[in-house]
Regions:
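Acidic, surface-exposed loops and disordered segments
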Residues: 1-193
Length: 193
């Protein structure tokens, strides 16, 4: 089992940060994040998520018009904002990712199945992204408040990728955090049958 310190880093002491320290993250850290999360499970090893790392001011300015007002400051101030999206043609890689069967045939021409599979598994991969980021010492701020159509048009004009959510990553400013909000107790959220 992981140590209590590691569990604190990933879960119990981790927070979603909206304010950031003026400290850059490195491309090596970004590489570490992906090289951890890629090993986490997806159905049929389909791996449909795609990650666009926005670090430069020019790229952030391309993102800004798509952001809801409440997310502008926390996104623009983050050392890096990541677009978690899915590849609408993820099945093209299945001959490599899932070589034990003709998995591609299960998706070709089946738009709803492609969309449902891609959204579900990319959301999982987005959660793995958060845990991987925390494991390399970074803080996160996942956000939904943005215009997906506008963002997709700006960053993915060919329509192949579709955004799910964005996430600021960096070193959070703990002095700006509110007191942690409560969570549901086991009996309120779970049952054993």
């Amino acid at each position: 089992m992981l140590s209590n310190k590691n569990l604190d880093t990933l879960f119990t002491k981790a927070r979603s940060h909206k304010a950031w320290l003026n400290k850059d993250i490195t491309n090596h850290q970004i590489d570490q994040i992906y090289n951890l999360l890629k090993f986490a499970p997806t159905s049929g090893n389909c791996c449909p998520a795609r990650f666009t790392f926005i670090k430069t001011n020019d790229s952030k300015n391309r993102l800004k018009p798509a952001l809801d007002k409440g997310n502008i400051e926390q996104a623009m101030d983050a050392p890096c904002v990541v677009i978690i999206s899915y590849d609408t043609e993820f099945y093209e890689s299945l001959s490599i990712l899932s070589p034990h069967s003709d998995a591609k045939a299960n998706f070709v021409g089946k738009e709803n199945k492609v969309k449902n599979t891609a959204e579900f598994n990319s959301t999982l991969q987005g959660a793995y992204f958060i845990m991987a980021s925390r494991s390399v010492g970074l803080d996160c701020c996942p956000m939904l408040g943005f215009n997906k159509e506008m963002l997709n048009k700006e960053f993915f004009p060919d329509g192949k990728y579709k955004s799910l959510f964005i996430c600021g990553i960096g070193y959070g400013d703990s002095s700006k955090l509110y007191e942690r909000a409560p969570r549901l107790d086991f009996i309120e959220a779970c049952c054993i049958v």
